[in-house]
């Protein structure tokens, strides 16, 4: 991975707009969430570098959807693809809120549908609930 995709350490004078936005976004989180979102953003930055894109400026919804497709082509399950996009979508959302980009390219990006297996959901029926109360 080249230095263009490095998110940390914090060196504002030598960081790109995308790196500063990533550090700003990640500063909101701690622990496992910070670690997970850092990983997700490193993956996004690496994909952008391989694709010749800036990871923040000039990104369009089509780029985000191509990335989503590439995650599926790597063999990730639909639920994992959706999970991998949490950090990336948050990154764009906060970059837009902070005025770094004029629009959020990920807001309308189509994610895979994830079906919950209702048969595995445990719950009480009406009579069990009445007895419980």
Predicted regions and their residues:
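Alpha-helical structural motif
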Residues: 18, 40, 125-128
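N-terminal core-binding DNA-recognition domain of tyrosine recombinases/integrases
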Residues: 19-35, 42-120
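Short alpha-helical hairpin
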Residues: 5-22
């Amino acid at each position: 991975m080249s230095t263009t995709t490095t998110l940390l350490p914090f060196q504002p004078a030598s960081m790109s707009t995308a790196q500063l936005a990533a550090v700003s976004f990640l500063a909101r989180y701690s622990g496992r969430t910070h670690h997970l979102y850092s990983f997700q953003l490193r993956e996004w930055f690496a994909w952008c570098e391989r694709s010749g894109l800036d990871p923040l400026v000039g990104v369009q919804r089509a780029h985000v959807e191509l990335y989503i497709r590439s995650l599926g082509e790597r063999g990730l399950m639909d639920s994992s693809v959706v999970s991998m996009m949490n950090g990336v979508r948050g990154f764009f959302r906060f970059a837009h809120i902070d005025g770094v980009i004029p629009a959020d390219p990920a807001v309308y990006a189509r994610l895979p549908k994830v079906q919950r297996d209702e048969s595995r959901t445990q719950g009480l029926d009406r009579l069990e609930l009445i007895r419980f109360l």
